[in-house]
C-alpha cells in the first residue's frame, strides 16, 4: 500500500492544442462558444446575442460605409480537459526500499499522481486512471481502467483521494505494460479521450515503449506527457565504487551478490546509464514531447519538477492563445 500524507499544491496544465471536451471547463476549445479567447470577427446575423456585438468595430465600419453595420466577435468555448494517469507497475517500479537513502519510487509515483490529480481537479478536468498491475478486482497483466470522471463536489477532494487509492495495487505488471496501456487507450470504447486530452505516463522508462505506440497516441491528438521517475545515483548515473565491495540484489530482494568493481567498470556503468537517460530524452524530443524528470520523492522537489515543465511550455509558446 502506497499512501503519502500532506498536500502538494497544484501546477498549471498548459495544453499544446485547443481541446475538444465537455462544456464549462477551464481550457480553450477548438469549438466556438461563450469563452474569453477571441476566435475572430464576422457580420451580425439574426439570432446573435446583443452582448456579442463589438460596438467600437461596428461604429468604425459604419462610418466607413455610411450605413448601419454590426460586427460580432466569435469566441472559443471553455471546455473540460480530460486527464488520464498511466502508471507503470513493473516490479522495478517498487525500488528502492524506503529504508535506504535512495529514490523510493512508490512514494515518488504517489506524489506525482497526487499532484496531477489535484491540478486536474483545480482546472475542472475529468480524471482517469490506467495500469496493468494486480488489484482486488483484476489480475496482473489485465487493464485496470477507470474512465475519466468529474469531481462530485467542489468542497471535497474525493476524486484525488479515489485516484490515490488505485496505487494500492501490486508491482507485478508485465515489462511491456506501458506499451499495452497506450494501445489499450486507442482501442477501448468510451475512453472519453478527445483531442487535446492529457495522458501522463509515469514510469522509469528503462523499458521504452515502441515508437509506434507513442506515435499512435500522439496521432490521436492526445497530449502525451512522459513522467520519468529515476534514481539520480543508480539509474541516471552510477556511483564511483571502483575498488569497493558492494552488494547488489534482484528486484524482489531475494538474492544478493557481493561484487568488487574496478574503476573502469564503474566508469563504464556511469557512462552507460547517463547515455541511456540521454537516449530516453532524445526519443521524447524527436517525438516533440515535453517530459518531466523526477529524481526525488520529496513533494517539494516533485512540485518543482512539474512547475519547470509548465513554465517551459509557456516559454516555448506551447500554450495556445
PLM feature segments, named:
Residues 1-33, 43-51, 57-66, 72-114, ...:
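Exposed, interaction-prone extracellular/peripheral surfaces
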Amino acid at each position: 500500500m502506497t499512501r503519502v500524507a500532506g498536500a502538494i499544491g497544484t501546477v498549471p496544465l498548459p495544453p499544446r492544442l485547443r481541446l475538444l471536451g465537455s462544456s464549462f471547463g477551464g481550457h480553450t476549445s477548438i469549438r466556438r462558444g461563450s469563452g474569453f479567447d477571441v476566435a475572430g470577427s464576422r457580420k451580425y446575423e439574426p439570432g446573435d446575442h446583443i452582448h456579442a456585438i463589438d460596438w467600437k468595430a461596428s461604429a468604425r465600419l459604419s462610418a466607413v460605409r455610411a450605413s448601419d453595420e454590426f460586427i460580432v466577435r466569435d469566441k472559443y468555448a471553455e471546455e473540460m480537459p480530460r486527464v488520464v494517469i498511466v502508471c507503470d507497475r513493473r516490479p522495478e517500479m517498487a525500488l528502492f526500499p524506503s529504508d535506504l537513502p535512495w529514490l523510493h519510487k512508490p512514494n515518488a509515483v504517489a506524489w506525482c499522481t497526487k499532484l496531477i490529480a489535484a491540478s486536474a481537479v483545480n482546472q475542472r478536468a475529468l480524471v482517469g486512471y490506467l495500469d496493468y498491475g494486480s488489484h482486488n478486482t483484476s489480475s496482473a497483466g489485465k487493464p485496470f481502467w477507470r474512465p475519466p470522471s468529474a469531481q462530485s463536489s467542489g468542497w471535497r477532494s474525493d476524486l484525488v483521494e479515489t485516484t490515490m487509492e488505485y496505487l494500492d495495487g501490486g508491482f507485478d505488471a508485465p515489462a511491456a505494460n506501458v506499451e499495452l496501456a497506450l494501445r489499450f487507450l486507442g482501442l477501448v470504447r468510451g475512453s472519453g479521450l478527445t483531442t487535446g486530452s492529457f495522458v501522463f505516463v509515469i514510469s522509469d522508462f528503462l523499458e521504452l515503449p515502441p515508437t509506434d505506440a507513442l506515435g499512435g497516441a500522439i496521432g490521436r491528438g492526445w497530449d502525451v506527457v512522459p513522467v520519468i521517475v529515476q534514481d539520480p545515483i543508480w539509474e541516471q548515473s552510477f556511483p564511483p565504487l571502483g575498488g569497493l565491495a558492494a552488494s547488489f540484489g534482484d528486484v524482489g530482494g531475494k538474492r544478493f551478490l557481493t561484487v568488487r568493481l574496478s574503476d573502469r567498470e564503474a566508469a563504464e556503468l556511469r557512462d552507460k546509464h547517463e547515455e541511456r537517460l540521454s537516449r530516453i530524452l532524445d526519443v521524447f524530443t524527436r517525438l516533440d514531447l515535453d517530459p518531466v524528470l523526477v529524481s526525488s520523492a520529496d513533494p517539494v522537489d516533485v512540485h518543482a519538477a512539474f512547475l519547470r515543465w509548465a513554465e517551459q511550455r509557456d516559454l516555448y509558446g506551447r500554450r495556445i492563445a
